[in-house]
């Protein structure tokens, strides 16, 4: 059995930054550190940080006065930000800069009284945070998930209308929704640069290349990870059997027993150690040496807040 690895896969710059913010805060200030929502959607990462003293909460009211609070990589609404500001808290923002870019687009539309449409998945924390940047009652903020949603949507003024997207969506599905928006509202204005982030796009391109060669595709990522789910769905659309797994222990030998080639990738919030564990598990089932496919190089780095720019090893 051949083992192929997608390239790129795993951590993106936004996830790296968010985890570093929590790790550095723990090193500098000591436990406990409070984090609103899971800092990234990966069980292994969250459990590891929890063991080191991070406390994950959903409501600001759960945080005691004088504590350190970190916003997750998914971002928060302006209401949450204001609530935290009203408290005696030290706040660090781990929102991915590419999510912040979308927040700024929505806030700009709100200030102008223009209506905005967000393409995204209802209930996802990134969507809640992005929708929560809009506050102008003269305009309006709407959420759509599919072309069908677009055709039933009514707005106040089609001449002052813009759209944005969640950063972790399926590129293909989003393209279909954008096409519907442009047909339904010919004057709608989109972002100058695509809101779907580079890491989401690159990992979807990589899983396409992987699925062209593999019989079975394993996507390492947690069930609540939007970008990981999109990778598994894309492989399935290409006619491959695909499984979304948290770690190597999830793999059943029956999944790969008849496969000549198994492809492995990982969502943007999944650490490489989980991929290495999957490779080891597949080798127990008769797999050979893992081969990494050629792919797009990524060299983007997002800085942590200056107060947290410290070599953790020096603190420890």
UniProtKB/Swiss-Prot annotation:
Coiled coil: none annotated. Gene3D superfamilies: 3.40.50.11270, 4-hydroxy-3-methylbut-2-enyl diphosphate reductase, catalytic domain. The active site is at 126 (proton donor). Its cofactor is [4Fe-4S] cluster. GO terms for cellular component: cytosol. Pathway: Isoprenoid biosynthesis; dimethylallyl diphosphate biosynthesis; dimethylallyl diphosphate from (2E)-4-hydroxy-3-methylbutenyl diphosphate: step 1/1; Isoprenoid biosynthesis; isopentenyl diphosphate biosynthesis via DXP pathway; isopentenyl diphosphate from 1-deoxy-D-xylulose 5-phosphate: step 6/6. (2E)-4-hydroxy-3-methylbut-2-enyl diphosphate binds at residues 41, 74, 124, 167, 225-227, 269. One of its GO terms (molecular function) is metal ion binding. Dimethylallyl diphosphate binds at residues 41, 74, 124, 225-227, 269. Binds 1 [4Fe-4S] cluster per subunit. Its EC number is 1.17.7.4. One of its GO terms (biological process) is terpenoid biosynthetic process. [4Fe-4S] cluster binds at residues 12, 96, 197. It catalyses: isopentenyl diphosphate + 2 oxidized [2Fe-2S]-[ferredoxin] + H2O = (2E)-4-hydroxy-3-methylbut-2-enyl diphosphate + 2 reduced [2Fe-2S]-[ferredoxin] + 2 H(+); dimethylallyl diphosphate + 2 oxidized [2Fe-2S]-[ferredoxin] + H2O = (2E)-4-hydroxy-3-methylbut-2-enyl diphosphate + 2 reduced [2Fe-2S]-[ferredoxin] + 2 H(+). Catalyzes the conversion of 1-hydroxy-2-methyl-2-(E)-butenyl 4-diphosphate (HMBPP) into a mixture of isopentenyl diphosphate (IPP) and dimethylallyl diphosphate (DMAPP). Acts in the terminal step of the DOXP/MEP pathway for isoprenoid precursor biosynthesis. Belongs to the IspH family. This is 4-hydroxy-3-methylbut-2-enyl diphosphate reductase. It comes from Salmonella typhimurium (strain LT2 / SGSC1412 / ATCC 700720).
């Amino acid at each position: 059995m051949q083992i192929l690895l997608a390239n790129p896969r795993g951590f993106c710059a936004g996830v790296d930054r968010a985890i570093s913010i929590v790790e550095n805060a723990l090193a500098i200030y000591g436990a406990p550190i409070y984090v609103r929502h899971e800092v990234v959607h990966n069980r292994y990462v969250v459990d590891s940080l929890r063991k080191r003293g991070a406390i994950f909460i959903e409501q600001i009211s759960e945080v005691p006065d004088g504590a350190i609070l970190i916003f997750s990589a998914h971002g928060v609404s302006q209401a949450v930000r204001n609530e935290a500001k009203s408290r005696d808290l030290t706040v660090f923002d781990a929102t991915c800069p590419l999510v912040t870019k979308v927040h700024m687009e929505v806030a700009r539309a709100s200030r102008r009284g223009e209506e905005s449409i967000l393409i995204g998945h209802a209930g996802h924390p990134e969507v809640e945070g992005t929708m929560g940047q809009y506050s102008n009652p003269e305009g309006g903020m709407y959420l759509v998930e599919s072309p069908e949603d677009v055709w039933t949507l009514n707005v106040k003024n089609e001449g002052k209308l813009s759209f944005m997207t969640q950063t972790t969506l399926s590129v293909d599905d989003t393209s279909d929704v954008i096409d519907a928006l442009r047909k339904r509202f010919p004057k709608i204005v989109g972002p100058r640069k695509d809101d779907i982030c580079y890491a989401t796009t690159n990992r979807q391109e990589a899983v396409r290349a992987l699925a062209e060669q593999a019989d079975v595709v394993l996507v390492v990522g947690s069930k609540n990870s939007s970008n990981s789910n999109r990778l598994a769905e894309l492989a399935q659309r290409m006619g491959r059997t695909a499984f979304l797994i948290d770690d190597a222990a999830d793999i059943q030998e029956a999944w790969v027993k008849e496969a000549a080639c198994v492809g492995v990738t990982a969502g943007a919030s999944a650490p490489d150690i989980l991929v290495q564990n999957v490779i080891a598990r597949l080798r127990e089932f008769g797999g050979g040496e893992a081969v990494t496919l050629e792919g797009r190089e990524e060299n983007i780095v997002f800085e942590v807040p200056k107060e947290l720019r410290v070599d953790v090893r020096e603190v420890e």
